[in-house]
Amino acid sequence: MRRHYFSPKTGKACIGLHKIDGKYYFFNKYGIMKIVNTVDGKTTYYIGSDGVIQARKKGNTMYYANGKKKMNQTAYEYETLLRAKAVVAAITTPGMSQSEKFQTCYNWVIKHYYNTRRIFQNQTSWPALYANDYFLTGSQGGDCFSDSCTFAYLARALGYKNVYVCVDTDLFDDSGHCWAEINGLVYDPLFSEAKNYYKYFGATYASYGLSPIRRVRVN
């Protein structure tokens, strides 16, 4: 991966924020591309390992890489993902394989005790709402929604793309059950804890026994 770029106009090394081939990057004063989150003045740049800026934050306001303000819902979901990444960094090690990190995150979710905090009402950004039960106030426990939404966000933080949270009813009450779906397989932390760990860790829908009525992608 190239860490230095030069301006086609001046021939000098890029310094600071630059748009290259439609993507945004940040270079330090020596012209080296940053590949970790970076603070410049009052702005925090959230940067992927490929150097591409994913978002910016100034004060309490979140922006897209291009400087456009994120809608409140989108900003809330992105900040939830940042919390998930912080948890992953805290509970895994660089020497772990991807599958080891994945299962470590699953086990971290299971350690939280059961507690129903609210009745499901299909709230705006409800996957992030329930994930923050553990990311922000984990000592208060959570239910199947908290478990599954948290694990879904942790999976996204690990780089998994096809991540969903599912519910087996379209009712707005406490009758539904929630689980995570990742790459087409079911991951149900609550059932793994209460019934059979491996039966509900990476289950097929044929063996799982429930079908999704609500299915929401976690981005």
Sequence positions of predicted segments:
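Periplasmic OmpA-like peptidoglycan-binding domain that tethers envelope proteins to the cell wall
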Residues: 131-146, 156
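Short, solvent-exposed mixed-charge patches
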Residues: 217-219
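A glycine-rich, coil/turn loop motif that links secondary-structure elements
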Residues: 122-126, 141, 170-172
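Extracellular adhesion/carbohydrate-binding repeat motifs centered on closely spaced tryptophans
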Residues: 1-78, 167-181
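Hydrophobic/aromatic-rich core segments of domains that either
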Residues: 146-211
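General structural signal for secondary-structure boundaries
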Residues: 34-37, 68-77, 124, 128-135, ...
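Secondary-structure boundary elements
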Residues: 76-137
